[in-house]
Amino acid sequence: PAALPGMFERTVTVFSFSKGMGFSGLRVGYIVCCDSIMDPLFATAVAVVGATSTAAQQAATVALQHPGFMKQFETAYDKRRHRAVEILNSVPGVHVMLPESGFLCWVDVSELGDSTEIAAYLTAEARVSVNDGKNYGQGGAGHLRIVLGVYRDDERVFAALEAVRDALLRYKK
């Protein structure tokens, strides 16, 4: 939208290394916007959030200078997200679209029941922890967020997804 005529002055674009480069927990990101918006944003961010650690800044700098290191992650996550969609969509009443990138699946379980109950059920029955979509805002009810980046080994990720699938197939409202 910022490239459209007259929109740069009204657009704030936020980039996160956490999701885009797998830097979860390092709290590195940046904003692109016009100066009249940036000045108050910068002052607020420094006062509220503080500064990013030196180690995180160095890691981000290296990542930007050597983008090839991300290729191995892209390949692994591409395989995982395609397999996750295949496994989870095999459950009647469960719907998941292929994530555009990254390691998070947004799973619609609304046809099966309450997402809070289902998340607790999966922890107990499948022994896999998932996030209740309700924690991500009003539109998250009926959804689960599943992280595909927990293990290095693909087979452990796929085994966890299969355990989720098997538990959901047994789930009764």
Language-model segment annotations:
Residues 6-78, 87:
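Conserved core segment of the aminotransferase class I/II
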